[in-house]
Amino acid sequence: MKVSDAAKRIGVSTKSASRCFDELEYLNIDVLGMKGKSRVINIPDDRKQLWQQIERVLRNPVIRRFVLREDMKIEKKAGISALCEYSLLSDNVYPTYAVTKRELKASGVKVEKQVSELEEIGCVVLELGYFIDFLGKGFQDPLSVVLSLTGEEQEEERVDISINEMLEEYVWSKD
């Protein structure tokens, strides 16, 4: 897949996709090749092995985490709430939503009151550097879900099982 095709597929500019290719090259991740004069990405058949190779160098897409008093009822689900949509895991009593850096101001998240330690949580909103709507249903993509989860969330056995189920069904087994 060429840089321009990759950019279209994930909904970013060609320049952003080119920077991603540059980072892959810099990190010495063996997925880039040349087709004529164009750089191309060649995803190996064993996606799970590739993920295990690159997960340690990928950045968490979460820029900031807002823990709010009121449920903002935002359409995009992220983090643990998105994981629940992909698996049989039950969600927290409060949902986790996503807004991109661009959407943050218009969403009103910054003016909402954050909870103190003793208050009940209405929702969690993750400000993300990017949001890939994986199934066109407003759910964060599975790989970004894994990167977005806190260490505490990932340590829970039920969450770990759900992560593995999600990756197996939506990522490793996909054509």
Label each region the model flagged:
Residues 52-175:
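Long, low-complexity, charge-rich intrinsically disordered regions
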Residues 32-50:
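Short, Lys/Arg-rich nucleic-acid/phosphate-binding segment
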Residues 22-26:
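Residue-level detection of the helix-turn-helix DNA-binding "recognition helix"
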Residues 3-8:
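Residues within the helices of the helix-turn-helix
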